[in-house]
């Protein structure tokens, strides 16, 4: 004879089946609210979610409901994240809602306006809290999809403007339910790298709904808490996201973000050449000016007068020569100082400068070695020196302490 179950046992069995199903444990649903009830004493919300053909009961407990940014009501279309389980006492399966927001352009707009007001009141968008973008960046962190056009555009412009810049990528989805958490985690990850000097976060444009991940409070919070300056590059020239408002600098496109991130080294070189030419022309003008003065003096009658008059003019000429010499020396010293400062700034950016002091660049399969954990015994490494490249094999590995912490 087959086992006979009680009603409670059957309901519990069905509940266990639903609770163990990974698909039913994390669902995103869209539907219309009907029969909405808020119990003031408990704070729990009960309603029916429906579409044109079906309905399902739903509950949102107080611990989740108090985090809502809007007031649910009948007839409102919503997007929610929930799990499916059975209320065993009644044998009724229903949704247990974890997160809910208005759906559709109108609903999203109202939701974002309320969130924007809340964040503005906390000072998230205040201009005085925004960090300055560094002038000479050597290492840029990027939070975006590794497969997107945005990453290719950013890297292309970075290499055009500054061939020596290094890129650190934190891969993330840029749309969908997982995107907000991944974007926020990418920002936190890049903040853990002390070498990263600037972060670009963004995507290659899209519809208003596609950009919703960059309106997430999770992402806004992560940008606000970043210790590293952040440039937003959502790729939409008209619509501003909340990420744009909280970022230290907003770029209309990923390409523009890359242009804002690093200095144009070719332009700097041209500027130095221009300074040199201006200095030379200024000196030539001064020399011509005083030469003409001397020539005019030489043409005057004084040179035909007795020796006493000639002596007086000789003294004047001597004074003029001294003035000319001092003036030109001062101009030359000032221009030379400016030129030296600009040349030093440019020269300090060159990796070859470090190699001149006897240092080398150690690489493994094209990647720079920064930590002994990247190297194993038997690895073949490439050594870049000032005037030669070597290939070596690791035969011994020993951790040593070079200086006191």
UniProtKB/Swiss-Prot annotation:
- Top-level taxon of origin: Bacteria
Q: Which CDD domains match?
A: ExoVII_LU_OBF
Q: Where in the cell is it found?
A: Cytoplasm
InterPro entries on file: Exonuc_VII_L, Exonuc_VII_lsu_C, OB-fold_nuc-bd_dom
Catalytic activities? Exonucleolytic cleavage in either 5'- to 3'- or 3'- to 5'-direction to yield nucleoside 5'-phosphates
The alphabetized UniProt keywords are: Cytoplasm, Exonuclease, Hydrolase, Nuclease
Family statement: Belongs to the XseA family.
User: How does the record describe its quaternary structure?
Assistant: Heterooligomer composed of large and small subunits.
Q: What job does the chain carry out?
A: Bidirectionally degrades single-stranded DNA into large acid-insoluble oligonucleotides, which are then degraded further into small acid-soluble oligonucleotides.
* HAMAP family named among the record's database cross-references: Exonuc_7_L (MF_00378)
Name by which UniProt lists this protein:
Exodeoxyribonuclease 7 large subunit
Q: Which organism is it from?
A: Syntrophomonas wolfei subsp. wolfei (strain DSM 2245B / Goettingen)
């Amino acid at each position: 004879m087959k086992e006979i179950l009680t009603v409670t046992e059957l309901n519990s069995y069905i509940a266990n089946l639903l609770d163990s199903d990974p698909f039913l444990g994390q669902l995103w649903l869209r539907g219309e609210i009907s029969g909405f009830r808020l119990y003031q004493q408990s704070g729990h919300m009960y309603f029916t979610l429906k579409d044109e053909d079906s309905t399902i009961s739903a509950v949102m407990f107080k611990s989740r409901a108090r985090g809502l940014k809007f007031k649910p009501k009948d007839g409102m279309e919503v997007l929610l994240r929930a799990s499916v389980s059975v209320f065993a006492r009644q044998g009724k399966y229903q949704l247990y809602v974890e997160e809910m927001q208005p759906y559709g352009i109108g609903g999203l707009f109202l939701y974002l306006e309320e969130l924007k007001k809340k964040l503005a009141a906390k000072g998230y968008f205040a201009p005085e809290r925004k960090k300055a973008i560094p002038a000479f960046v050597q290492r840029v962190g990027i939070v975006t999809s590794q497969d997107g056009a945005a990453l290719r555009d950013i890297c292309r412009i970075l290499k055009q403007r500054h061939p020596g810049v290094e890129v650190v990528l934190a891969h993330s989805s840029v749309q969908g339910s997982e995107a907000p958490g991944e974007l926020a985690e990418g920002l936190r990850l890049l903040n853990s790298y002390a070498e990263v000097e600037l972060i670009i976060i963004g995507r290659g444009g899209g519809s208003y709904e596609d950009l919703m991940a960059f309106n997430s409070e999770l992402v806004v919070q992560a940008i606000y808490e970043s210790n590293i300056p952040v440039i937003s590059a959502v790729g939409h020239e008209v619509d501003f996201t909340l990420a744009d408002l909280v970022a230290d600098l907003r770029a209309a496109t990923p390409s523009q973000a890359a242009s804002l991130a690093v200095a144009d080294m070719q332009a700097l070189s041209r500027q130095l050449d221009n300074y040199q030419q201006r200095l030379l022309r200024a000196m030539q003008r001064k020399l011509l000016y005083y030469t003409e003065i001397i020539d005019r003096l030489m043409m005057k009658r004084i040179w035909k007068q007795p020796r006493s008059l000639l002596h007086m003019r000789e003294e004047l000429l001597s004074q003029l020569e001294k003035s000319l010499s001092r003036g030109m020396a001062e101009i030359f010293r000032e221009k030379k100082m400016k030129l030296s400062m600009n040349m030093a700034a440019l020269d300090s950016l060159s990796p070859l400068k470090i190699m001149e002091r006897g240092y080398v660049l150690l690489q493994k399969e094209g990647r720079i070695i920064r930590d002994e954990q990247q190297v194993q015994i038997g690895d073949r490494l490439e050594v870049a020196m000032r005037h030669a490249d070597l290939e070596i094999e690791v035969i011994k590995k020993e951790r040593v302490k070079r200086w006191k912490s």
